């Protein structure tokens, strides 16, 4: 290469270096501007995300294509030109808004009915909120797992077996039902006289399964305002589905499940509406889901036939008055932690407690302990139990005379 060519080549390289330096300087300025913009937007987001939020419900999600919208001579909003999902929300102030830009939450994670927090000025969705349940329904969830066991229940072996087949087996061994191709029962109705162990067996069943236990009392579902009781039933089943596997125990079902009749009273109609919502929920969830219903009542004769039909409360378990052998077993169970003399004859005690239910047999053991405590003894004798039987019988007769 000649000297002139080298000089020319050097000049070209110098000009290329200058161009590249100016390009680097321009890109550096752009990068700094972008950083400033990101910082500014982050500050705006931080300001927008300050609490409190306006609570809203997602009504509908829409797919909007800006190419479908033709506006002649009108100013075009950049936000409306973004292709993707849009949302229709309803705020707690009962106003409905259409959002072309959803906000900071991924649109794919939203679904109609979700509870969201929006900015009170721009209405952009800032955060998804947990599902709202009635505080009374949350209070129905039993936080502490029941400690009762099947060995604490005497004289109900057949009833225990039927309840295990209907509730425990579908939860713990679902594959056995799938292999046979049968559908497990949706629910169980336990009926019988008071004090025969219905609630006790339900608590023992909840203790044997690792399920969430929701305890509803029938009178709790009878509310003053129209639709309030039905909302409690809906929220209870929604909470049970969210926390599945779960067991819903409805005690004193006859408070809301009595036979329907024509009535002019608003209170009677409200009770019937609550029962219709219960029927709807029993039909609504699939039998394969891990939500089971146990209902208990001592007035099965006044229940509505719609509740008793197959497909709702499929398994019906009767709790009769305990026989002589069952009464002896119940008193043995309640006396096993007491300091009892070896001469106590439980068979003879069972023969003396004719027409006693399980709760009264337990009361005999408690009364015997109090009698022994009264005379300063260190152990319970057979005579203490006999006196306890007399005490419980006297209370029983007094109650009968009082109610008569």
Curated annotation (Swiss-Prot):
The keyword Secreted does not apply. Coiled coil: none annotated. InterPro entries: 26S_Proteasome_ATPase, AAA+_ATPase, AAA_lid_3, ATPase_AAA_core, ATPase_AAA_CS, NA-bd_OB-fold, P-loop_NTPase, Prot_ATP_ID_OB_2nd. It holds the Pfam family Prot_ATP_ID_OB_C. ATP binds at residues 192-199. Its main location: cytoplasm. GO terms for biological process: proteasome-mediated ubiquitin-dependent protein catabolic process. Keywords: ATP-binding, Cytoplasm, Nucleotide-binding, Nucleus, Proteasome. It is found in: Cytoplasm; Nucleus. The 26S proteasome is involved in the ATP-dependent degradation of ubiquitinated proteins. The regulatory (or ATPase) complex confers ATP dependency and substrate specificity to the 26S complex. May form a heterodimer with a related family member. Belongs to the AAA ATPase family. This is 26S proteasome regulatory subunit 6A-B. It comes from Xenopus laevis (African clawed frog).
